[in-house]
Amino acid sequence: MKNEMLALILAGGQGTRLGKLTQSIAKPAVQFGGRYRIIDFALSNCANSGINNVGVITQYQPLELNTHIGNGSSWGLDGIDSGVTVLQPYSATEGNRWFQGTSHAIYQNIDYIDRINPEYVLILSGDHIYKMDYDDMLQTHKDNLASLTVAVLDVPLKEASRFGIMNTDSNDRIVEFEEKPEHPKSTKASMGIYIFDWKRLRTVLIDGEKNGIDMSDFGKNVIPAYLESGERVYTYNFDGYWKDVGTIESLWEANMEYIGEDNKLHSRDRSWKIYSKNLIAPPNFMTEDANVKDSLVVDGCFVAGNVEHSILSTNVQVKPNAIIKDSFVMSGATIGEGAKINRAIIGEDAVIGDGVVIDGSKEVEVIGYKEVVGVPNED
């Protein structure tokens, strides 16, 4: 695809609804599925779609994300004609540092985009779990002679009020956009994935800034402006698995759905692999008393207890007689002897003491990064 289309991943979200899990890292850097971070899905989709240049726009707590992405080699994006560029906010002459919205983040990086000089820009969110062929979406964009194409997912009517809803004609041309409507007319929900003709979007963003017109957000400002001016705006209809993991409940659900031979994400599909930074760890070890059922156990784990329908990430320790059920345990965590974990997310390097009970039967429980529970303070 060469430089025909540049992908820009919006990865600066703080993810306040994830609570303890994002106190020290950005939401796209949160672990998922045992060996991944959430942003791996967008990056892998880019690599599998033949996109050579990717800009990752960061903001909140970017260190872990920057370290994880590195030079892009884990996704094959470190070649002579390809690359991943991490783009951070900067202090502009008018004093703005933090991005004011999704499209404002693009405006602040116009110089970078112009250097790549793409015909199209693909705007992505770095905090969704899904697989998508962006090249197929681009072909739809071209076939419709569109200036903007919005990826949409058909959602249940009762959930439509949570999304930006696209009302279309019989040819999938968008005639109306409603942001979280109280009484939705359609069930076509925006996925926050857009393809724009770059020259046109560039003009819209620059003119908006020059004339004092708020163009800071794609959903609130840019899409309505395109429709009002009669631009050709179409949908790309997606029918695969897609999950917004912006809440504790949805992150837990997505991990539980990831377990199993027939998971909806088709994680074992060799034709569309999800790549990540390779971590060096020894093989996992299970004692003769260990009992592991219907679970994912990643390299480096030591298991001497009971694990059922759960995910153990890299280098997790489960001590004797511990019971873990319906839970996601992030890398480096230690589960003490006789501890009982049910419907929980255990953060990276957390320590759960001997005999501690964490029960999320009513509401998913969360233990944060390096949090220590039930271990006496040596001081």
Swiss-Prot record:
Disulfide bonds listed in the record: none
Biological process terms in GO annotation: glycogen biosynthetic process
First-level EC class: transferase
GO MF terms, alphabetically ordered: ATP binding; glucose-1-phosphate adenylyltransferase activity
Coiled-coil stretches: none
Keywords from the UniProt entry: ATP-binding, Carbohydrate metabolism, Glycogen biosynthesis, Glycogen metabolism, Nucleotide-binding, Nucleotidyltransferase, Transferase
Catalytic activity of the protein: alpha-D-glucose 1-phosphate + ATP + H(+) = ADP-alpha-D-glucose + diphosphate
Chain residues that bind alpha-D-glucose 1-phosphate: G164, E179, K180, S190
InterPro entries listed in its UniProt record: ADP-Glc_PPase, ADP_Glu_pyroP_CS, GlgC_bac, GlmU/GlgC-like_hexapep, NTP_transferase_dom, Nucleotide-diphossugar_trans, Trimer_LpxA-like_sf
Superkingdom of the source species: Bacteria
EC number: 2.7.7.27
Metabolic or biological pathway: Glycan biosynthesis; glycogen biosynthesis
Oligomeric form and interacting partners: Homotetramer.
Similarity field: Belongs to the bacterial/plant glucose-1-phosphate adenylyltransferase family.
Biological role: Involved in the biosynthesis of ADP-glucose, a building block required for the elongation reactions to produce glycogen. Catalyzes the reaction between ATP and alpha-D-glucose 1-phosphate (G1P) to produce pyrophosphate and ADP-Glc.
Protein name stated in the entry: Glucose-1-phosphate adenylyltransferase
Naturally occurring in which organism (per UniProt): Streptococcus agalactiae serotype III (strain NEM316)
